Amino acid sequence: MSVLCVLLLAFVLPLRGSSSAGSTECKTYDERSRSAGKSSPSGATLDRKVVCSNMEFRQVPSPDTFPNRTVSLILSNNKIQELLNGSFVGLSSLERLDIKNNIITHIEPGAFYGLFSLKRLDLSKNLIGCLHVDVFKGLTNLVKLNLSENKFSSLSQGIFDSLGSLKILEFDSPYLLCDCNLQWLVVWIKEKAIGVKETRCSFPRSLQGQLITTLRAETLTCDAPLELPSFQMTPSQHQIVFQGDSLPFQCMASFVDEDMQVLWYQDGKMVEPDATQGIYIEKSMVQNCSLIASALTISNIQPGFTGNWECRVRTSRGNNTRTVHIVVLESSAKYCLPDRVSNNKGEYRWPRTLAGITAYLPCKRQVTGAGIYSGSSAEDRRAWRRCDRGGQWAEDDYSRCEYMKDVTRVLYIINQMPLNLTNVVQTAQQLLAYTAEAPNFSDKVDVIFVAEMIEKIGKFAEKYKELGDVMVDISSNLLLADERVLWMAQREARACSRMVESLQRIALLRVSNGALAYSTNSPNIALEAHAIKASSFNGMTCTLFQKLSPERTVMAHHGEISPERQLSFKCNVTSNLSALALKNTIVEASLQLPPTLFSSLGSSGQAEEAVYKLHLLAFRNGKLFPPTGNSSILSDGSKRRSVVTPVMITKIEGFPLRDLLSPVNVTLRRFLQGSDAVPAFWNFSLQGGQGGWQSDGCRILHQDDNFTTVSCHSLNSYAVLMDLNRTGYNVFIFRPLHPVIYSTALVLVLCLLSVIVSYIYHHKSVRISKKCWHMLVNLCLHILLTCAVFVGGINQTYNASVCQAMGIVLHYSTLATALWSGVTARNIYKQVTRKAKRYEELDEPPPPPRPMLRFYLIGGGIPIIVCGITAAANIKNYGSQVNAPYCWMAWEPSLGAFYGPAAFIVFVDCMYFLSILIQLRRHPERRFELKEQSEEQQHLSVTEATEITPVHLESSPTAQPVPMSALENEHTFVSQLMGVAGSLTLYAALWVFGALAISQEHPADLVFACLFGALALGLGAFLVAHHCVNRQDMRRHWSQACCLIRRNYAVQVDSLLLPIAGSSGSVMTSRGNGEATKCPASSAESSCTNKSAPSLRNSTQGCKLTNLQVEAAQCKVVAPSTANGTAVLDNSLTEHSVDNEIKMHVAPIEIQYRPSSVNNNNLPGNANITGHPGRHHKNRSRAHRASRLTVLREYSYDVPTSVEGSVQSVPNKRHHHESLHARNSRRAAYLAYRERQQSQLQQDSSDAASTSVPRRSRHFSKGTRIGNGFGHGISNGGLLDGSEADVTNQTKECPKQTLTVELEVQPKSYGLNLACQNGSAKDSERLNVESSGNVKTGLWKHETTV
């Protein structure tokens, strides 16, 4: 027995421990009872609170596991799936039950039985789909109930009837459907005054987000379209399967009505179960009383199953569907090749796609405006394209994408806007602003959108009068659009015909409102309406003309029609054509209505008293009447006819259009020329409403160059069609210019060619600077280009491209001519104002030569930039004016692109001309432009008598004539100025008269043509005379070119003569007073190595003369005396060579006889004779020049002026002159004879002789250093030895036989430095600068000759 008790205890104790284990795992807390605390505070009983959160319970623990006094039970955050009947029996003291955040899907009735004291119940955040009506039965003390965030969409009526103490209710759900099934709940809440916290409707969308307490019962209906809170189909994406596979489908939807059914469809056909095909369908069943589901299984899928499979939920309130596209692939699948599609929605590159698949691509431009394009999600904003089963691309859809062009997108947005009385005027103005870009329309939808908007705006035209004007302006803008775009819009949606019909309705509305007349106009469309009484009608004549309309402000239009030219009607109440007293008008068309127009209606009194509404509508061209189909009138054989006149529409409301007793005569102006003219009228009903041209009942009465008169027996749309050339444009009738223009222009071209060819062919021999040569050739070339383009291309208006090219070239050549004239004037001004050059410092390199390209950048670059910008802005600025008789720029662009720049350039040119005149008046001595001398020429010049700059020759009454060889330009500055100014003036006048000759009507054009011819002849003669005939070198070249014998003779003569030799061989020079003198040629001149005269002209090889020969030639190198007696010194031999120092006494020097520019105008009283040598020779290095000049300066202190080193005697004894002259003459003749005998056999003996040169102190005669003589080292106080005195005496005996000689040396042959640069010699006297004798630095007194 004891053993049995032990075993029983061993069995019972574990059971008690396990049964209490659940409760012991929960946390228990003591909680003071509120009722006990009030009744007996001292002896209060303790209540228990049990917390079983996060315990992973899958069901509610047994109530026995909880303490008896449990008043609060927390079972949140577990995995409880359902609440069974009697789950909380025994917890009669429980006041709070929290079961939130579990996965409860079902609650059985009686689950809360026994909880009589329960006051708060929280069932939120579960999966409760529905609640039974008796689920809360017995909870009489429940105060707060929370059912939020569950899956139920509705609550059964009477579910809260047993909750008599309920005060707070929460049942917010993302699936809550506020329909007729919740009407009872709204009424119950208001009756019981239940507090509902944050409970809002989720469906339908019309009530979404509204609080349940704010709804009225009548707003909760079941009439709205069916909206299911939950509707899912699996799979939801498109499927690609292979033949023979199995594919299951499942469909689930919220259960909202008892009669709900789930059905399956394929491509719109209901699918039934078919075991033979492997199709199985499970019956509908309700899950958790909130969802209805169905399953479809295809066990053996076949290619025929490809298509859209649809799950359809059918209820009495409506249907709802979900669709999946299925593609069944066979074993040999095909593919669509990659493709690129470009349209108004962008460019799309479709990839290689499997046959039967629909490919999707995102839109190129994302949606920027809400509510404009269908579909707001990114998935909907896609373009798709289907690849059919044959591997070919099939239908596509881009409608959900935005247009790429801004204009098209804005027009689409405007078209989608709803119009009303408040915004119609503003919308019409916006549309007018955007149609100003009509010339740039490239998409047919642009025109379609505008046509649709015009129709919408026309509905409000009766209310607002200004809308009619706006509609006319909008339609006028569309006439500037491309004809191809209008044709496509007409074919797509009858856009053009709809606009014309809308404009016709405007006129009728105006006259219907009681107005007797109405008119409006625009650049391309004119509208006129009249109320006509049949009894008083005597005929009418209406004329269409274009004129500036000051009444209305017209927006600027882009395109070929100028906004100033407005089309307008002028009507007279008579049938005859009256003279129009209208200024600055161009007649485009005229219409004559006969007096018998209303006779066909009979003579009844009612008909005679009737008032008819007549409206006239005129279009500048036929773009709004594009034929979309072929007709006999448009294509007759190989001919293709097009509208070549304005289109005029005439219509009388309520009046028959055909079979008039008297015809209507219409005169139309042709803007295009063609052949085979046909009168026609537009029939809106042809081609299935597309419209077309017909010619029945119309004939041509008269036709001339510009106008065609048509007679028709009907009231309709009138026009003339003609056969054009294959390019679709007019057959050009060439209208030549006046013969005077052609003949005189030809003469001008020949003159310009002669000047250009002469200067190019004789470029190296003509005496003109390089700059002037380039400027003259370019000036003549651009004048030639202007003349040629004007004569040959100004009237080439038949082709727009050719005409534009002519306008651009004429624009460029005109500006370039003016700029080259300015460049030439600037060059003359710089030469006139240029200062004399000084010796550069030794450390300063010579400036580099400036490129000639700078002139081309100005003369040609600026016009190219101006023309390029003008053409890039709008190429139609050139040669695109309608009916323009010549190829030139439009008026407004030409103001800023041509007339303004041309006027400014000419103004700058005139300022340069005036500045040159002022400078020449201030400095009359500046006449010529001289050559720049090289370094050797500057150091060896022997003929400079006064200051001579490299640029100017200062002219004075005593100046010597300038040799031609010293001139850089044969023309004087005044002559150059006259040439460029005269050319520019004649060119400008020629341009003006040419423009007037082609722009004016007869007979003014004849007058200006004659003036053009006279100026062309004058300009050609002026250019030839000034630049060719008036130049010695060019005359010589022309004379040589004319006669071959004479040319050969001239070459021989030129080779025998020295540059400035006279006819007898004497060399010409000038005195100080300007008297010409001669000096006979000495023996020294003819003893130059026994060479002939032609050899002396070679500029690169001179005669080798010894020092004695140079002395013998001194008779020819004596400089002339100045007018005031000041001596002019000779410094022809002033260079001292360091490398030839030993041989300097007898070294031969190579001299070349050539003229040198001299000017003997020294002022009296000057202490020194100054000279300004030019820039050093550019090919010498800086170091070479520096070392050379340094040695020269050093030896200038030490080198004596005689062989023995003795001091030369300064005073000149007059009684020794004759003896010295005789001795020196005999000596020179002997040495010349001896040199001729020995020059070819051996080297001159003087090359081997040398004499030691004693140095003298550097501070010797420091105060008498030689000054700045123009002869490079010549001093006023130069010393003369005996031989120098002889030469001076000899010069006296030959006062009129002076020769200007310049010695040029080879690189290793230098002259003798005979002047002391540091001052006069010891014990010498100063030379009187006012003496009248000619002082020269003499040669060596003694010459050693072997």
UniProtKB/Swiss-Prot annotation:
S-S bonds: 251-311, 698-712
Subcellular locations according to the entry: Cell membrane
Spans within the Cytoplasmic topological domain: 761-773, 826-854, 919-977, 1027-1346
CDD domains per record: Ig
Compositional bias (Gly residues): 1266-1280
Record domain GAIN-B: where: 563-728
Record bears the keyword Metal-binding: no
Domain Ig-like: 229-327
PROSITE patterns named among the record's database cross-references: G_PROTEIN_RECEP_F2_3, G_PROTEIN_RECEP_F2_4, GAIN_B, IG_LIKE, LRR
Ranges facing Extracellular side: 22-739, 795-804, 876-897, 999-1005
Source organism, top-level taxon: Eukaryota
Ranges of the LRR repeats in the UniProt entry: 66-90, 91-114, 116-138, 139-162, 503-529, 574-600, 611-632
InterPro entries recorded: Adhesion_GPCR_A, Cys-rich_flank_reg_C, GAIN_B, GAIN_dom_sf, GPCR_2-like_7TM, GPCR_2_extracell_dom_sf, GPCR_2_extracellular_dom, GPCR_2_secretin-like
Signal peptide interval: 1-21
GO molecular function per UniProt: G protein-coupled receptor activity
Basic residues biased stretches: 1173-1187, 1212-1226
Keyword presence, Lipoprotein: no
Disruption phenotype: Morpholino knockdown of the protein exacerbated the convergence/ extension (C/E) phenotypes of other planar cell polarity (PCP) family member mutants (vangl2, scribbled).
Pfam families the UniProt entry points to: 7tm_2, GPS, I-set, LRR_8
Assigned GO CC terms: external side of plasma membrane; plasma membrane
Keywords associated with the record: Cell membrane, Developmental protein, Disulfide bond, G-protein coupled receptor, Immunoglobulin domain, Leucine-rich repeat, Membrane, Receptor, Repeat, Signal, Transducer, Transmembrane, Transmembrane helix
Function: Orphan receptor that acts as a critical modulator of planar cell polarity during gastrulation. Controls the localization of dishevelled.
Name the record gives this protein: Adhesion G protein-coupled receptor A3
Gene source species: Danio rerio
Lineage: Eukaryota, Metazoa, Chordata, Craniata, Vertebrata
